[in-house]
Amino acid sequence: MKAEAKDAAALAPMVKRLWPEHDLQALVRILTEYIASPESAVFACREGDRFVGAALCCLRHDYVEGCQTSPVGYLEGIYMEEDCRKTGLARTLLGQCEQWAKEMGCREFASDCELTNETSLAFHLSLGFTEENRIICFKKTL
């Protein structure tokens, strides 16, 4: 299902397990912005009255590794509760993101993960993604 603004607060604690560096209020704000923007979407799945998974996707107009077109649909994050992994629900969420991207005019869909996140790498490869590059990012304070 496509998440609505009223779902942001209920989704935030689960999404915090994906991005623990963010506080809950920041995640509610991020989710609310993603839900409201025509350039992004949040899809979620429930079991009974609890959310068990969520996927955040957006349109990227900048360069995306390995892609030749613009905009590119981009999976910013996907999370499934432990007891719902390997059930096909994440595949369904990804499919909803991909369909949304097609409807937005995209011909390519991309994602990323940390170099050390072997679980995410296996997930992406199992769902038809191909690895395009490995990078280490740098910064310095000016």
Regions from the language model: what does each represent?
Residues A110-S120, K139:
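Conserved beta-strand-loop-alpha-helix junction that forms the acyl-donor binding cleft
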Residues M1-L11:
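A short beta-loop-alpha structural element at the N-terminal edge
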Residues A44, R50-L59, Y74, Y79:
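Conserved beta-strand in the GNAT
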Residues M80, K86-Q99, A122-S126:
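Conserved acetyl-CoA-binding loop-helix of GNAT-fold acetyltransferases
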Residues Q68-E82, I136-C137:
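Conserved acetyl-CoA binding element of GNAT-fold acetyltransferases
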Residues A12-A26:
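Helix-loop element at the rim of GNAT/NAT acetyltransferase active sites that forms part
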Residues D23-R46, L56:
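Active-site rim helix/loop that mediates acceptor-substrate recognition in acyltransferases
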Residues L94, A101-C113:
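Conserved GNAT acetyl-CoA-binding A-motif
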